């Protein structure tokens, strides 16, 4: 479950060059092998739904200029199954401010902020502002203080005369390979505690939805939108945190990677007082709309309580769509780097790629009005 975008600095911006990435050596151009590989690329995009999103974005990218054009082309290439050599965690973060602006315009009251690190989040807790807001920020390496690629989302409530309550949604796992993720979450918790926030009023929710290596920014953006749309349910969670409790934690914590580690440890591995839970136990079903794994979607829908069996698309659609149907509609076969960083042919839902294409389209549509 070490499938998180780690290492490197968020501040080092990558420039995607589709010409450089896709142009073969002269000796390979227009050869049968080249044509066969091109046909193979086309076959990898097997989802008609994803192809529609690709087609919707193409005309906007065609008329775009500058870095956003390169970003859009990179997203199109990835969604089409072409090989790209860039980190989308970095590309997404570079263009996140534009997406945050668009989503704040589309969703009054979202109050979404993009912070450079968790320390900016702490500063926002101590300043005048809306009583409810969401924030996306990269994690920080405890050893070097360097911001990393992996991003998370925090849903925040400020309480008059009391300490804030914070729900951090982790799109992948809390622990991670060699406990690196856990150490970074612990750094955030430590700094929150030193700033005066009781850790009994902080929860980390692990969804395990992110299986690809670098889609954390898109998951975090989607989670912020979903948290706002399900604000009443989040209000209930915040109300419990005000009293130092998180419902179902006694059973749910064991279903997280943190709980699995704690079961084999004789000491506390996360800062004492902070809460942890598995996303499917506390979050609405639409938080798993873009989950990559069909196995996970099927397992969630088999829950006895039925809380993950509902629709994940909006009421505006004529037909309801559940987790498995969504996953199958965006399922593609593509060569990806998996957790062990070895190439493998695999099938998964590229729904999160579709979300990225949609967000880029919204940014470009605003620019080209």
UniProtKB/Swiss-Prot annotation:
Activity control, per UniProt: 1D-myo-inositol hexakisphosphate activates protein-acetyltransferase activity via an allosteric mechanism: 1D-myo-inositol hexakisphosphate-binding induces a conformational rearrangement that stimulates the interaction with acetyl-CoA. Acetyltransferase activity is activated by phytic acid.
Active site: 150, 170, 216
Free-text description of this protein's post-translational modifications in UniProt: Autoacetylated at Lys-289; while autoacetylation at Lys-289 is required for virulence function to some extent, it is not essential.
Positions bound to CoA: 150, 177, 211-212, 292-295, 331-334, 344-348
Domain of life: Bacteria
TM spans (from-to): none
Protein name, as recorded: Serine/threonine-protein acetyltransferase HopZ1a
Organism name: Pseudomonas syringae pv. syringae
Gene name, Swiss-Prot/TrEMBL: hopZ1a
């Amino acid at each position: 479950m070490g499938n998180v975008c780690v290492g490197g600095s968020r501040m080092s911006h990558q420039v995607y060059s589709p010409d450089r990435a896709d142009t073969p050596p002269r000796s390979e151009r227009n050869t049968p092998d080249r044509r066969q590989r091109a046909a193979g690329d086309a076959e990898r995009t097997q989802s008609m739904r994803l192809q529609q999103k690709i087609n919707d974005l193409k005309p906007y990218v065609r008329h775009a200029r500058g870095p956003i054009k390169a970003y859009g082309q990179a997203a199109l290439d990835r969604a089409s199954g072409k090989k790209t050599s860039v980190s989308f965690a970095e590309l997404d973060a570079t263009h996140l401010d534009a997406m945050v602006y668009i989503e704040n315009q589309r969703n009054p009251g979202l109050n979404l902020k993009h912070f450079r690190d968790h320390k900016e989040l702490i500063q926002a807790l101590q300043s005048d502002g809306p009583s409810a807001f969401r924030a996306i920020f990269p994690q920080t390496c405890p050893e070097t203080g360097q911001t990393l690629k992996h991003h998370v989302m925090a849903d925040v409530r400020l309480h008059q005369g009391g300490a804030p309550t914070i729900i951090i949604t982790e799109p992948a796992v809390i622990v991670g390979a060699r406990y690196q993720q856990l150490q970074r979450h612990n750094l955030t918790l430590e700094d929150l505690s030193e700033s005066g926030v009781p850790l009994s009023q902080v929860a980390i929710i692990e969804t395990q939805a992110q299986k690809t290596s670098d889609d954390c920014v898109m998951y975090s953006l989607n989670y912020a939108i979903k948290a706002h749309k399900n604000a009443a349910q989040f209000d209930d969670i915040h109300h419990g945190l005000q009293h130092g409790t998180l419902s179902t934690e006694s059973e749910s914590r064991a279903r997280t990677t943190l709980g699995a580690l704690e079961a084999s440890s004789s000491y506390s591995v996360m800062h004492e007082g902070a809460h942890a839970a598995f996303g499917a136990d506390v979050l609405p079903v639409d938080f798993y709309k873009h989950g990559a794994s069909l196995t996970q979607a099927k397992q969630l829908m088999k829950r006895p309580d039925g809380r993950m069996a509902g629709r994940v698309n909006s009421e505006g659609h004529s037909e309801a769509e559940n987790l498995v149907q969504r996953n199958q509609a965006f399922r593609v076969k593509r060569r990806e780097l998996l957790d062990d960083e070895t190439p493998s042919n695999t099938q998964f839902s590229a729904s999160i790629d579709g979300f990225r294409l949609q967000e880029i389209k919204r940014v470009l549509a605003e620019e080209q009005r």
